[in-house]
Amino acid sequence: MFKRRHFLRIAGAATAACVSRRALAIQTTRGTRMKPRQDLLDADSPKGLEVFQLTQGELSGAHLYMEAQIFTLDSKRFLLHRSATAHGGGRSDPKHQYFVCDLEDGGLLEPIIPEMGGVAPSVSPDGRFVYYFIDETKPGVGRFLLKRVNIDGGGRQTVLTVDGPLPGTDFRASRLYPISTISSDGKRLAISAFLGDGKTDDADFGLMVFDLERATVRLVLHGPTWCNMHSQYSRSTDGDAAHDILIQENHGCVIDASGAIKKLTGGEGADIHVIRDDGTNFRNMPWGRDGNEFCQGHQCWRGRTDWAITSTGTRSPRGAFLIEGKAAPHAGHVGLKTPGGLRNDLTRDLKEAKFSHFAGDALGKHFVSDAGPFDKGGRILAAEFGEPGRDALGGWRYLLNPRSTCKKESHIHPFLSPDGTMAFFNSDESGVLHAYMMRGF
C-alpha cells in the first residue's frame, strides 16, 4: 500500500502530520562551533594549512560516507551526524542525530532530522532541501517513509509512505542502505534495500528509484549479489547522462535470512556497473575480475564527466591503485577485460600506491585521498586532475597524519567541498571518533 502526499500541496511546516511512530524519541540539541586543531599538523604539512574539529565531547561524531551528496553547491553548508561511526549510525539509537554544519557561522551544528530511524539523507542539487528516509522495516514487514525538509529545518513533509510490496512486485523493501543518491536535476532519488522475507538465505537486494515530482517508486534492478550497491547518480547535467547510476555488484557474497552480510565477496570479487535509472542500458566498468586486480569497493564519478574512479588492490605489482574508467557495453562480468572499456592509471607516476578512500570536487579538478601506512595513523594526500582518460594525477602533496586507529568504525574517509577548497575527514585521535575539516592547502 502506498500513501502519497504531493509535497507541493502540503502546507509549510506541518511536521506532525506524517511523523514516524518513533519520531519524538530523539531529544534534539544544538551543537558547538568548530575548534581549531593546529596541533594535528606536523613538519611535513604545508604552510597555511588550517585544521578544525567539527564535533566535540564524549559522544562520537562522524562525516557521512564520502560519496554521499550532503553539501550545498555553494560549499557553505553540509550534513554530518553524531553517535555514529564512519559507516553510519544505529536506527534504534535515540542519540543518533543528523546536523547541518554551517561553515559560514563557524561550523555551528543545527539539528535537521528529529525522528529516530532517520537514514540516508541527500541534499538537493539546488541546496534547498534535505531528502531522507525513516526506516521502520524488518524483513518482510513494516514501512518506510521518504521525507523532505528545507535546509533550514522548516517545511518538513512526507513525500511517500511505503507499507506494502513495491509496485508491480511481491518484494517488500527493508534494511534501507545508509546512503541515497539524487539526480543532478533534483527530480529523482535512488536507494538500495534488502528484499528478502526474513526466512530465506541469499535473498535479493534491489535498487529503488523515486520520482520526486510524482511521489512514486519503482524497483529497477534486483538480485542476490546487490548487497552493497553504493549507488551514485551521475553528476552530469546532460539530459541523457543525468539518468546514469554507478552501482557495485558483490559476487560471491553470503547473506543470511535477515539480510545481514556474512561474506562480502568471493572468487574474483566485486565489479562495478552503470545502469540507466529506468533499469535499462546495463554496462560494465573496466575494473577488476581478472584474478589479479580486485575492486576495493570505493568508487565515484569524476566531477560531471562520464568517467569514474575506483581504488583497486593488485597481487602483482603489489599495491592499491587509483584507476579511472569509462563504461562499455555489458559483456559478462569480466571487469577490466570488457571489450571497449577505457582505463587510465591515475597513480602510475608514483613509486608506491597505498590508496583506499578518496573523493574529487564537483568540477573534477581537485582530489583527496587517504593512504597507508594505516597502522601508523594513515595519511591524507591532495592532488590535481589533468585531462580525463589521459593524464595521471599530479601536484601530489601531503597534508597531515590524522592519527586515527583506522579501524572500520574510524575509517578516515576524506572528501572535498564542491568547490575543492576544503577537505574533511574522520579521526579517533582523541580516543573518541570525531569529524574534522582542513582548508588552506
Where are these regions (language model features)?
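Short, conserved, GDST-rich strand-edge loop motifs in beta-rich repeat architectures
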Residues: 83-93, 135-141, 191-203, 248-268, ...
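Asp-box/WD-like beta-propeller blade repeats and closely related beta-sheet repeat scaffolds
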Residues: 116-124, 128, 132-196
